[in-house]
Amino acid sequence: MNHFLKSIAKIYWHLLVSPEKEARHLGVKIGQDCLISTRNWSSEPYLITIGNHVQVTDNVSFHTHGGGNVIRRFEPNFDAFGKIEIQDWAYIGAWSHIMAGVTIGEGSLVAAGSVVTKSVPPGVVVGGNPARYICTTEDFFKRNLKYNVGRKLTRKEKKDFLLSMSEDQFIRKPYIKTNE
């Protein structure tokens, strides 16, 4: 019966409670006006601090420890942990992994799918595995400003608007360079 009740509770949290509310319940410290879409908070969520105006997108994973099992072969009682801090106005892209001891600096952007193994300075864009510097957020803003449609619309209004736009108003990425 206990397993059944735990299953019901898990379904309740995932269907009826927002990811942000669940994170706060688990002990994640979250600032004001954040958009939290993940539920992957490691086994020590109380070691994670998120500032104000932060966006953490789908399936981002936070890791407050790891690798201890290899060391336990030599030191059976080994365990090590690291706090994670996401500072104000940061953005963490979908499916990224934030490792123990990392700070994401104010106004920084972590590209989707990144593995962040070192702290990120304020105001930069990083991406990749492991995450590497791409550009400043100021450069990112300047490059993308021409694509700004400047609207907050309903789903239907957005669809109609986007389908009416010309091709040059959409973001287009260059091809990956090859050696051929």
Residue ranges and their predicted role:
Residues 7, 79-93, 97, 131-180:
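C-terminal segments of enzyme domains that contribute to small-molecule binding surfaces
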Residues 32, 87-88, 103-106, 120-123:
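Structural motif
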Residues 91, 109, 125-126:
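Short-chain dehydrogenase/reductase
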